[in-house]
């Protein structure tokens, strides 16, 4: 064996060791996952238990199954219990004209949401993302508590671990859009949940790209699970990378159905992390 080939094999062994180590770390975090007791003000995220009644859960599941998404949106936006969660921030806050039905798959890379104050010039108030779970999940959402307070404190997380929140059907999670968060990798890929946006009326003009926004995500992720685990771990170590793409994410958020252009870089990212170039180019629900 030549000296040069010996160096190559050393590099290969190091890469294999790193991959194994990252996966052991990720699996260890999954095994230790426990219910999180977090508050919206302090941690940037909060779990609200049993917001949706069993009858409405069944009703809304059926509306999703039969693709009656407009009817679903009307019922969810007018639901008294959901409105109480919205108003718990402040009586002035409202649901935006927005719904995103997630029937399959999840975003398994750490990121902040487009509607965060960090990324929208002229935005005066915090904006929030609400997730309504219509099925129980062993892990619903991964978060880095407190990361909403500064764009730079959790830009790189060498020792910081993501905390997985456990929830049941009918529960609601609401989080500050500035919060670093990530979808969970569970045994099932088709856990039904619905995402909505909660904002202050003063900011609707700035966040107008999320008005009349009605999307459905029902796509398989074609990448192997072990690769997704690695991508999740690396992206949550360096969430600052995602911050650099926010401007482009906002400009293309409405999708080609509404005339937005998806760049080559974004298509490449979608292919690398989700196995298809059009993963983020979602069709209109109605």
Label each residue range with its predicted role:
Residues 1-3:
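N-terminal Lys/Arg-rich, disordered targeting/topogenic segments
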């Amino acid at each position: 064996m030549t000296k040069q080939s010996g160096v190559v094999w050393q590099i290969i062994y190091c890469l294999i060791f790193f991959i194994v180590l990252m996966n052991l770390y990720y699996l260890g975090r999954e095994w230790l996952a426990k219910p999180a007791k977090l508050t919206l003000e302090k941690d940037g995220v909060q779990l609200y238990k049993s917001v949706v009644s069993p009858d409405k859960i069944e009703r809304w599941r059926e509306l999703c199954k039969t693709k009656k998404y407009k009817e679903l949106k009307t019922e969810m936006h007018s639901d008294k219990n959901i409105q109480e969660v919205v108003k718990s921030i402040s009586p002035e806050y409202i649901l935006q004209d927005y719904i995103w039905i997630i029937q399959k798959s999840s975003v398994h890379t750490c990121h902040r949401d487009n509607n965060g104050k960090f990324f929208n010039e002229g935005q005066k108030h915090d904006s929030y993302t609400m997730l309504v779970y219509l099925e129980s999940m062993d892990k619903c959402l991964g978060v880095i508590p407190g990361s909403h307070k500064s764009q730079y404190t959790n830009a790189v997380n060498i020792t910081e671990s993501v905390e997985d929140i456990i929830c049941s059907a009918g529960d609601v999670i609401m989080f500050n859009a500035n919060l670093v968060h990530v979808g969970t990798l569970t045994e099932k890929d088709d856990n039904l949940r619905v995402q909505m946006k909660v904002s202050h009326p003063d900011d609707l003009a700035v966040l107008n790209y999320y008005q009349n926004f009605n999307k459905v995500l029902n796509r398989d992720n074609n990448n192997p699970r072990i690769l997704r685990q690695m991508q999740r771990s690396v992206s949550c170590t360096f969430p600052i990378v995602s911050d650099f793409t926010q401007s482009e994410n906002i400009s293309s958020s409405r999708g080609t159905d509404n005339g937005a252009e998806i760049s080559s870089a974004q298509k490449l990212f979608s292919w690398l992390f989700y196995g298809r170039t059009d993963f983020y180019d979602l069709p209109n629900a109605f």
